[in-house]
């Protein structure tokens, strides 16, 4: 079986004396929806950074869609992420001098593969549809600096989903959303994954969301992975 994500003998440390992650094996099948949890400082965001190619493992293999990211240069990892990964950052990473629709369209405009996956639908039209689904459709010409935190988070969500990436990585994506908007987001996220067959890696402290996922991955205080059975 070819896994969407496969890690083996992975170790990572920001400084040599302080190991952050030690992962002997982690395999995630195409289309899996994996819920990642663990105490603060256990390495959840670091794990996402390795899977997205933002960080490079010190040892071992990090294979995403058959590509070992540890063998790629920084520029090549950036290109791979742009083509295949939709990342909802915990800090949003919006471009402050762009408005809402421009932020949503940004990665799709600079990445040919994402545009191709939209087919005949224009990028702006697809971006507007996502904004409408997330309740920010009337804010598309507004500067992101004028948005509430919850609205900024929904812009980040729309940007990550545009272009139907094969891998969706979400770092605390519901943390700034109220109950209604959280439900809207989760519905859209799971519908998008089902429609495209995307693999979802979702980090959250809210374990009440865990039953929605078919995989759960616990990061322990020892910075290692503990896997629950596949549902």
Where are these regions (language model features)?
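Conserved ABC ATPase signature
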Residues: 143-147, 151
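Conserved ABC transporter NBD signature motif
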Residues: 60-68
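Conserved ABC ATPase "signature" region
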Residues: 68, 105, 112, 118-139
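Short coil-to-helix segment of the ABC ATPase nucleotide-binding domain corresponding to the Q-loop/switch region
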Residues: 98-107
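Helix-to-loop junction immediately C-terminal to a conserved catalytic motif
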Residues: 52
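Catalytic Walker B motif of ABC-type/P-loop ATPase nucleotide-binding domains
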Residues: 168-171
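Conserved catalytic motifs of ABC-family nucleotide-binding domains
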Residues: 164
């Amino acid at each position: 079986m070819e896994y969407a994500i496969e890690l083996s003998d992975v170790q990572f440390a920001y400084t040599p004396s302080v190991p952050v992650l030690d992962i002997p094996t982690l395999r995630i099948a195409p289309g899996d929806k994996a819920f990642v949890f663990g105490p603060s400082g256990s390495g959840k965001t670091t794990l996402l950074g390795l899977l997205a190619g933002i960080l490079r493992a010190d040892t071992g293999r990090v294979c995403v869609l058959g590509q070992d990211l540890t063998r790629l240069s920084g520029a090549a990892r950036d290109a791979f992420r742009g083509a295949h990964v939709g990342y909802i950052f915990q800090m949003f990473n919006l471009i402050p001098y762009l408005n809402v629709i421009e932020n949503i369209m940004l990665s799709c405009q600079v990445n040919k593969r994402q545009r191709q996956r939209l087919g005949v639908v224009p990028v702006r039209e697809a971006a507007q549809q996502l904004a409408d689904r997330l309740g920010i459709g009337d804010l598309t010409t507004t500067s992101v600096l004028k948005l509430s935190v919850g609205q900024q988070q929904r812009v980040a969500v729309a940007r990550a989903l545009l272009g139907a990436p094969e891998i969706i990585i979400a770092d605390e994506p519901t943390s700034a959303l109220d109950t209604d908007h959280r439900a809207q987001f989760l519905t859209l996220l799971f519908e998008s994954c089902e429609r495209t067959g995307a693999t979802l890696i979702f980090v959250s402290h809210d374990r009440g969301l865990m039953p929605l996922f078919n995989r759960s991955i616990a990061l322990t205080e020892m910075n290692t992975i503990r896997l629950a059975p596949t549902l």
